[in-house]
Structures are given as structure tokens and as C-alpha cells.
Amino acid sequence: GWKDWAKKAGGWLKKKGPGMAKAALKAAMQ
């Protein structure tokens, strides 16, 4: 489910940093 995806994304974003988070959010919004 989306909650599992959110957990994975959260851990990944902590490693990758805020710049990647912003890019991912932009991609998700489209």
C-alpha cells in the first residue's frame, strides 16, 4: 500500500537529501 511506499520514500529521502525530495515531489505532482 501507499503507507509502505511512504516509509520507503521517507528513508530514501533522508539518505538522498532535500534536493532529491523536491524533485521527487515535482515528479509525483505531474
From Swiss-Prot:
UniProt protein name: M-poneritoxin-Ng3a
GO biological process: defense response to bacterium; defense response to fungus; killing of cells of another organism
Pfam families: Ponericin
Similarity section: Belongs to the ponericin-G family.
Tissue specificity statement from the Swiss-Prot or TrEMBL entry: Expressed by the venom gland.
Location(s) in or outside the cell: Secreted
Function, as annotated: Shows a broad spectrum of activity against both Gram-positive and Gram-negative bacteria. Also has antimicrobial activity against S.cerevisiae. Has insecticidal and non-hemolytic activity.
Main location: secreted
